[in-house]
Amino acid sequence: MIWLVLFGALFRSVSDIPGFTTGSYVEFLTPGLIMMLAISSAGWAGMAYIEDMNAGVMDRFLVSPIWRGALNAGSAAQNVIIIVLQSVIVAVLSLVVGGHFPNGVAGVAVMIAIAALLGASFASLSNALALVVRQRESLIGAVTSVTLPLTFLSTAFMQQSLVPSWIAWVARFNPVNWAVVAGRSAATGNTDWTLVLSRCGLLVGLLLVSAWLATRSFSAYQRSI
C-alpha cells in the first residue's frame, strides 16, 4: 500500500509522457504492484515447510498415506487466499487514490485471478526450494535476491516502449511480466484477450512445472533424513 501511495504520487507525471497508454500512473501501477505482492507473499511459503521439518511434523506427513502433491497444493491454496485478500485491498486503495478500472469488477477479478496463478507458482517453487535447502537463511537469501529483480525486470513500473531495450527483451521471458501484462490488459481497458489468454497459458505451464518440482523435492528431502 505504501508503494502505491508513494510511487503513485512521486511518478504521477509519468503518464504525460508520449507513448504512455493509461490515463493515470496509479492505474498503470496497480497491476504491477499486485503481481509484486503476489510473488513477495508466496515466496515465503517454504518457511512453513522448514518449520514443519524442524518440528518433526513433515516426517509424520511423509509416513502417512498422503499424496505429496496434496501437501504442496494445500500450501499453495493457503497462499492464494492471502494473495486474493491482499489484492482486493490494493485494488480498493487504488480507487481511493485516483485509480480507475475501465473494465470494472470483471476486469479486476481477472487481474486478481492472474495474481493468484502467479502466486501459486511461486509458492510451489518456494516449497521445492525449502525441501532442498532446509534452512531459513538459504530460503530468505534466495527469495530476497529473486523478488525485486524479477519485478524491476518487468513492466510493473514503466511502459515497455519506454524501458531500455535489454530490459524489454528480458521481460519477454519473465513470468512476473507475463502476469503484469495480462493483468493490466484485463483491468485497464483496451483488453487484448488473445494476449491475456496466451500469458495465462504460460503461467499455467509454469504452475504445472512448479508443482511437479515441489512434489519431486519430497524425494530429495526423504533421502536426506
Which residues does each predicted region cover?
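Hydrophobic alpha-helical transmembrane segments
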Residues: 1-24, 224
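Hydrophobic alpha-helical transmembrane segments of multi-pass membrane transport proteins
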Residues: 2-9, 25-97, 117, 126, ...
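Transmembrane helix-loop junction
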Residues: 9-16, 51, 60, 64, ...
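Transmembrane helix segments
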Residues: 9-13, 130-173, 177
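Short extramembrane helix-to-coil loop segments that connect adjacent transmembrane helices in Major
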Residues: 13-23, 99-103, 190-193
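Alpha-helical transmembrane segments and their short interhelical loops
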Residues: 68-143, 193-215
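Membrane-interfacial helix-loop-helix junctions in multi-pass membrane proteins
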Residues: 152-209
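Short cytosolic juxtamembrane segments of multi-pass membrane proteins
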Residues: 216-225
